[in-house]
From Swiss-Prot:
Family: Belongs to the bacterial ribosomal protein bL28 family.
Region called Disordered, residue ranges: 1-21
Gene Ontology biological process terms from the UniProt entry: translation
A Gene Ontology term for the protein's cellular component: ribosome
Keywords: Ribonucleoprotein, Ribosomal protein
InterPro entries: Ribosomal_bL28 (IPR026569), Ribosomal_bL28/bL31-like_sf (IPR034704), Ribosomal_bL28_bact-type (IPR001383), Ribosomal_bL28_sf (IPR037147)
Annotated protein name in UniProt: Large ribosomal subunit protein bL28
UniProt keyword Acetylation present: no
Gene Ontology terms for molecular function: structural constituent of ribosome
NCBIfam families to which the protein is assigned, alphabetical: L28
Gene3D superfamilies in the cross-refs: Ribosomal protein L28/L24
Amino acid sequence: MSRICQITRKKSMKGNSVAHSNHKTRRKFNVNFFSKRFYWVEKDCWIKLNISANGLRTINKIGLDAAIKQASKKGYLIIQ
């Protein structure tokens, strides 16, 4: 399972870890990512989404149905 949000397509970034001496080493900035179950009223079923905290805020803001339609329209999520 890749750590990519199914709603916002947010994924980890690469950058530098900078010491006080300005010595830089490559590191990875991970996303605040988790799996969560939602009850989809329109289809009358439970769905499991791999989402970031930003994706959860989007669902809370515009609703699950609108977020799923928006993500599937952009090609982030495939609905059967």
